[in-house]
């Protein structure tokens, strides 16, 4: 499961920052701790970088970040020092979690159940507020009198398996029974503060505050009927009547308004459908989703919900190796959303993805929406032209993207494949090294940069001289980062 980890070895625990003086964890220490945790999550088989879902999530995350800056909730120091990255996990459980250093984790299971964009924004605003309010540092300071090893327990807690009903998750999981009760009590205060601060971000960021109440209603219903471990968010974020009442009282009318924009949009329905399918629900569930458009109740659904059903049926058919069925449902989807620009774009991307999965690269290229400057188009087009032998078409867009997004590991992977296809092994090796560096695996990055140096020494091409100098410079920089990383152990 995404976020699972085995206990840290004694050497790793001993190398964590100590809290003997009871002082707050500094922002630099918290960032380093977060980087260590995130390095393990990048290696987790459930980690997924899906460009379509990732772009949709970023479209929520960035306005929330801007609102936090504008309202003074996000200090310039934290803004500069923390990572502010969102990671996705394939896990089907409904969960989200904040990590040290400005990292946020979202399970596809949660994205798959949120009813509106505003509901997803409410979860992300809440988690963002856990970070901006320095809850991790505050809690560790409170607990440091009991045991400095609590920081090690916090690392384990942040990575605890979400499918384990006995694990108290999210920000902190105490490793010792003595500390547990105080942690839970403090957590309630944190939850209320994150609710209040997070809700204050919603309207300035362009989201309806009613999304908080809608999400709370959904969680409350799940709390009543579901106790099978699939909603760990309820354990890590205890839902109390006080929290619900507090959020309702903060709405202008004390409840949902008739003019609330919290309605289902086709784009959102399609993204949540994608999240459900990519969470690997199993063959039987996929078959149910594929059959749903033929059910008697499909015609009575609102158009936006129909779009989600058709998207799941098309992508599910593709995963079941039914290319004809995938094309049929994708065609119906495109017809349904033809007057909705955002949904039409997603439908075209899906059609291209399905054609590529069916091994018809020319059809995939023809199905692509115009332009390749946006990340989903750029990465999918790269996969397609690598099949058609036209990889030079994407070299420029990839290089332009990486110039402004140097930590995009997936883009570096695509760049490596493109350079290999064009017979430029030195550039490919450098790109492979950058993949590891972007995921904080500096040891592996150093190995690839050194391999690049060896390759450059054997090269007789004058064009490789410039690339070799880049490799030398990057190797020195990454070796320095590796030494810092080793010193923390």
Predicted ranges, named:
Residues 20-21, 47, 55, 70-73, ...:
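Extracytoplasmic and endomembrane cell-envelope/extracellular-matrix remodeling and assembly machinery
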Residues 148-163, 170-178:
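Membrane-active amphipathic alpha-helices enriched in small hydrophobic residues
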Residues 105-122, 184-189:
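Short pre-active-site segment immediately N-terminal to the catalytic Zn-binding motif
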Residues 105, 119-127, 131, 173, ...:
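Short alpha-helical catalytic segment bearing the HExxH-like zincin motif
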Residues 115-119, 128-145, 163:
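Catalytic Zn2+-binding segment of zinc metalloproteases
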């Amino acid at each position: 499961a995404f976020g699972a980890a085995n206990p840290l070895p004694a050497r790793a625990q001993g190398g964590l920052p100590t809290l003997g003086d009871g002082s707050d964890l500094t922002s630099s220490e918290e960032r380093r701790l977060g980087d260590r945790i995130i390095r393990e999550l990048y290696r987790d088989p459930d980690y997924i970088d899906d460009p379509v879902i990732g772009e949709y999530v970023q479209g929520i995350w960035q306005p929330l970040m801007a609102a936090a800056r504008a309202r003074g909730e996000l200090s310039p120091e934290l803004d500069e020092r923390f990572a502010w990255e969102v990671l996705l996990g394939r896990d089907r459980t409904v969960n989200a979690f904040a990590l040290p250093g400005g990292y946020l984790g979202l399970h596809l299971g949660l994205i798959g159940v949120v009813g509106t964009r505003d509901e997803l924004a409410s979860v992300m605003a809440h988690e963002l507020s856990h970070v901006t309010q320095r809850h991790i540092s505050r809690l560790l300071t409170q607990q440091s009198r009991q045991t400095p090893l609590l920081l090690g327990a916090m690392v384990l807690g942040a990575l605890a398996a979400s499918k384990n009903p006995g694990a108290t998750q999210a920000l902190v999981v105490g490793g010792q029974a003595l500390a547990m009760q105080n942690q839970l009590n403090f957590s309630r205060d944190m939850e209320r503060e994150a609710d209040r601060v997070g809700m204050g971000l919603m309207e300035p960021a362009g989201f309806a505050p009613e999304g908080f109440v809608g999400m709370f209603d959904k969680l409350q219903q799940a709390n009543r009927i579901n106790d099978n471990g699939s909603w760990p968010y309820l354990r890590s974020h205890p839902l109390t009547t006080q929290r619900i009442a507090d959020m309702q009282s903060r709405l202008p009318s004390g409840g949902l308004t008739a003019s609330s924009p919290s309605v289902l949009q086709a784009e959102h329905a399609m993204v949540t459908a994608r999240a459900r399918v990519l969470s690997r629900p199993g063959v039987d569930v996929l078959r149910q989703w594929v059959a749903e458009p033929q059910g008697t109740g499909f015609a009575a659904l609102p158009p936006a919900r129909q779009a989600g059903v058709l998207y799941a049926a098309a992508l599910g058919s593709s995963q079941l190796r039914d290319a004809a069925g995938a094309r049929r449902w994708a065609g119906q989807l495109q017809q349904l959303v033809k007057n909705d620009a955002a949904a039409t774009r997603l439908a075209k991307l899906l059609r291209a993805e399905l054609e590529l999965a069916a091994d018809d690269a020319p059809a995939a290229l023809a199905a692509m929406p115009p332009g390749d400057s946006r990340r989903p188009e750029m990465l999918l087009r790269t996969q397609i032209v690598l099949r058609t032998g036209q990889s030079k078409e994407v070299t420029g867009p990839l290089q332009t993207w990486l110039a402004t997004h140097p930590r995009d590991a997936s883009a570096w992977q695509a760049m490596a494949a493109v350079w290999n296809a064009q017979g430029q092994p030195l550039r490919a090796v450098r790109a492979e090294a950058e993949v590891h560096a972007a995921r904080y695996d500096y040891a592996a990055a150093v190995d690839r940069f050194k391999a690049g140096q060896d390759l450059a020494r054997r090269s007789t091409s004058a064009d490789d001289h410039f690339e070799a100098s880049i490799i030398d410079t990057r190797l020195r920089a990454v070796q320095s980062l590796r030494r810092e990383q080793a010193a923390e152990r």
